[in-house]
From Swiss-Prot:
Function: Catalyzes the GTP-dependent ribosomal translocation step during translation elongation. During this step, the ribosome changes from the pre-translocational (PRE) to the post-translocational (POST) state as the newly formed A-site-bound peptidyl-tRNA and P-site-bound deacylated tRNA move to the P and E sites, respectively. Catalyzes the coordinated movement of the two tRNA molecules, the mRNA and conformational changes in the ribosome.
GO cellular component entries: cytoplasm
GO molecular function: GTP binding; GTPase activity; guanosine tetraphosphate binding; translation elongation factor activity
Keyword GTP-binding part of the UniProt annotation: yes
Species in which this protein is naturally found: Cupriavidus pinatubonensis (strain JMP 134 / LMG 1197) (Cupriavidus necator (strain JMP 134))
Family annotation (Gene3D superfamilies): 3.30.230.10, 3.30.70.240, Elongation Factor G (Translational Gtpase), domain 3, P-loop containing nucleotide triphosphate hydrolases, Translation factors
Protein name: Elongation factor G 1
Pfam families: EFG_C, EFG_III, EFG_IV, GTP_EFTU, GTP_EFTU_D2
Family under the similarity heading: Belongs to the TRAFAC class translation factor GTPase superfamily. Classic translation factor GTPase family. EF-G/EF-2 subfamily.
SUPFAM superfamilies: EF-G C-terminal domain-like, P-loop containing nucleoside triphosphate hydrolases, Ribosomal protein S5 domain 2-like, Translation proteins
Keywords from the named record: Cytoplasm, Elongation factor, GTP-binding, Nucleotide-binding, Protein biosynthesis
Record carries keyword Protein biosynthesis: yes
């Protein structure tokens, strides 16, 4: 089947923003203008097309990034048809995993900011993630019709808070109630949208006289920014020659793709103004799959050997599975991004991570929650597959004859746990199936059984994260569950080195006995280094075949530390000496010896309890700053700074132990009459104060 749209006209873009900056509304408008939706879905009345899970529609926030395909020929129909694959990403901090995984498969992003709120805390997290994956981006300042809207203040914040390099390509005409449209700095014309046609019709007019000087000033800045793309353009510019429109667009495009600048636009998605111009900017400035470097991976058998795949239909097939969803009609859907080659439904693909071949069932192109079955997917496209049983998020799918392992995604460790049990015993098995399905979809969600209590423990990125998963269990799987109080994911480590500690497991009472003897040195590692085992046995005092057993004995002991049974992290064990018995030694005896030596060494190495510390940012009206700061301090928080918000008010940044943050949203609401909001994300582990550690140990009964 021939390609309908050349790959140069593909744009794989994400739309991401702080919660409530109007991102889903912006996406809705895009779907409307690109002709996919005939009636605009409003988030206000819970009808938005992209927010397709029931909880999202109730809460008015986006949780799962739905992928949608749309087509655009330009605002005035003056471009050849381009194909947009749009990924809507959530703005709530408990779902950063969703943002992270969509960033990985995008080629460009539109960052939506609120003209009143400006650069809010979550915007900084998203910006950092986009930097990490080197995603070229545009900035769109939304809600220009709101009281307190200020485009230029947001411009300043992008520079100071995000260290961004925004280049406005439009400036607003009016603001708040008086917001009418924008001045297009490329055309040097005013664009006024027709409200009766929901912004489908528009006209170019002369720039209002009172804005001429502002428009000239910002056009000059834009042209200067374009001239910096090459020496040749700079010479032309400094020589007083005019740069052509095509030269400016190409230069800004090159610099955007190199992540040197971010073209900046504005509008009000709700009032249907400005989104259309942003879509043109996506064509003008954001990359197609061929404008970015080829994807790289490694050889299946030799992880040092680097391979690359170009975005070309004739290359060998390679794709990345970036999301799993359970669909009520077709079962498990795996969303994947094709980096090279093409694939037909019914073809066999190879998953080098799982070392399994699988046959691809149906292939679906998604439009929010509607789907269209297609026969083949080409390089640069995003689609969903039915029938892959073994693939999970982050796996590579490739041509069985040309294996490649694309870089895996790194998922954060959960910081909060809760016990969960079904309301009726009959639902126990159903709950197990539901939880495993949800864990397959979301790698930052874990399920385990507590060996001591037999309880099912779920872990995730925050209270809201777990609340929504329990809610989904009820809606999608019909399992109602009770959840216990949130538990903090503490860790244990050591502060000193313990040398020459021995573990001896001996059972000799007639017949075949048991004999294992290991001597270890245990030392602390720097935070985040994890566990390391070094074999320093000389002269065969422990035979080679028993050394892995000693390591296994230690590794099996790591999940349950000696202080309060929490996982032990950041320690290094060196096996230095030991002895064996010709007849009585076996693997089991050495496993026991390793475990005994490790526990004894932990006792001698000054064990300490670590607690998760959270980066907390509170947005509050100025009147409440004292109250909020006092409250954070009472929660053992350390206030690290304060910023001004665009529309007045303050952002307070603090580091607070997670254990002190339970129920914070309720107390913040009552302390500020519901006018303050906060976000929180995991920062690092720190040693818990003695009184806290003792309380935790007492609660664990150790």
């Amino acid at each position: 089947m021939a390609r309908k749209t050349p790959i140069e006209r593909y744009r794989n873009i994400g739309i991401s923003a702080h919660i409530d900056a109007g991102k889903t509304t912006t996406t809705e408008r895009i779907l409307f203008y690109t002709g996919v939706n005939h009636k605009i879905g409003e988030v206000h009345d819970g009808a938005a097309t992209m927010d397709w899970m029931e909880q999202e529609q109730e809460r008015g926030i986006t949780i799962t990034s739905a992928a949608t395909t749309a087509f655009w020929k330009g605002m005035g129909g003056n471009y050849p048809e381009h194909r947009f694959n749009i990924i809507d990403t959530p703005g709530h901090v408990d779902f950063t995993i969703e943002v992270e995984r969509s960033m990985r498969v995008l080629d460009g992003a539109c960052m939506v900011y609120c003209a009143v709120g400006g650069v809010q805390p979550q915007s900084e997290t998203v910006w950092r993630q986009a930097n990490k994956y080197k995603v070229p981006r545009l900035a769109f300042v939304n809600k220009m019709d709101r009281t307190g809207a200020n485009f230029f203040k947001v411009y300043d914040q992008l520079k100071t808070r995000l260290k961004a390099n925004p280049v406005p390509v439009v400036v607003p005409i009016g603001a708040e109630d008086g917001f009418q449209g924008v001045v297009d700095l490329l055309e040097m014309k005013a664009i006024i949208w027709d409200e009766a046609s929901q912004g489908v019709k528009f006209e170019y007019q002369d720039i209002p006289a009172e804005l001429q000087a502002t428009a000239d000033e910002w056009r000059e800045k834009m042209v200067e920014s374009a001239a910096e793309a090459s020496e040749e353009l700079m010479e032309k510019y400094l020589g007083g020659e005019e740069l052509t429109r095509a030269e400016i667009v190409k230069a800004l495009r090159d610099r955007t793709i190199a992540c040197e600048i971010q073209p900046m636009l504005c509008g009000t998605a709700f009032k249907n103004k400005g989104v259309q111009r942003m879509l043109d900017a996506v064509i003008d400035f954001l990359p197609s799959p061929v404008d970015i470097p080829p994807v790289t991976g490694t050889d299946e058998d030799d992880s040092e050997k680097k391979l690359e795949r170009k975005a070309d239909d004739t290359e060998k097939f390679s794709a990345l599975a970036f999301k799993i969803m359970t669909d009520p009609f077709v079962g498990q859907l795996i969303f994947f991004r094709v980096y090279s080659g093409k694939i037909n439904s019914g073809d066999t693909v190879y998953n080098p991570v799982k070392q399994k071949k699988e046959r691809l069932g149906r292939i679906l192109q998604m439009h929010a929650n509607q789907r269209e079955e297609i026969k083949e997917v080409l390089a640069g496209d995003i689609a969903a597959a039915v029938g892959l049983k073994d693939a999970t998020t982050g796996d590579t799918l490739c041509d069985p004859a040309a294996p490649i392992v694309l870089e895996r995604m790194i998922f954060p460790e959960p910081v909060i746990s809760q016990a969960v049990e079904p309301k009726t015993k009959a639902d126990q098995e159903k709950m197990g199936i539901a939880l495993n399905r949800l864990a397959a979809e979301d790698p930052s969600f874990r399920v385990r059984t507590d060996e001591e209590s037999g309880q099912t423990i779920i872990s995730g990125m925050g209270e809201l994260h777990l609340e929504i998963l329990v809610d989904r269990m009820k809606r999608e799987f019909g399992v109602e569950a009770n959840i216990g109080a949130p538990q903090v994911a503490y860790r244990e480590t050591i502060r000193k080195t313990a040398e020459g500690v021995e573990g001896k497991f001996v059972k000799q009472s007639g017949g075949r006995g048991q004999y294992g003897h290991a001597v270890i040195t245990l030392e602390p590692q720097e935070p985040g280094k994890g566990f390391e085992f070094i074999d320093a046995i000389k002269g065969g005092v422990i035979p080679r075949e028993y050394i892995p057993a000693v390591e296994k004995g230690i590794v099996d002991t790591l999940p349950s530390g000696i202080l309060a049974g929490f996982p032990v992290v950041d320690v290094k064990v060196t096996l230095t000496f030991g002895s064996y018995h010709d007849v009585d030694s076996n693997e089991n005896a050495f496993r026991m010896a390793g475990s005994m030596a490790f526990k004894e060494a932990m006792r001698k190495a000054s064990p300490v309890l670590l607690e998760p510390m959270m980066a907390v940012e509170v947005e509050t009206p100025e009147d409440y700053t004292g109250t909020v700061m006092g409250d954070l301090s009472s929660r053992r928080g350390i206030v690290q700074g304060m910023d001004d918000m665009v529309g007045g008010g303050k952002i307070i940044k603090a580091e607070v132990p997670l254990s002190e943050m339970f129920g914070y949203s309720t107390s913040l609401r009552s302390a500020t009459q519901g006018r303050a909001t906060y976000t929180m994300e995991f920062k690092h582990y720190a040693e818990a104060p003695k009184n806290i550690a003792e309380a935790v140990m007492a609660a664990k009964g150790k």
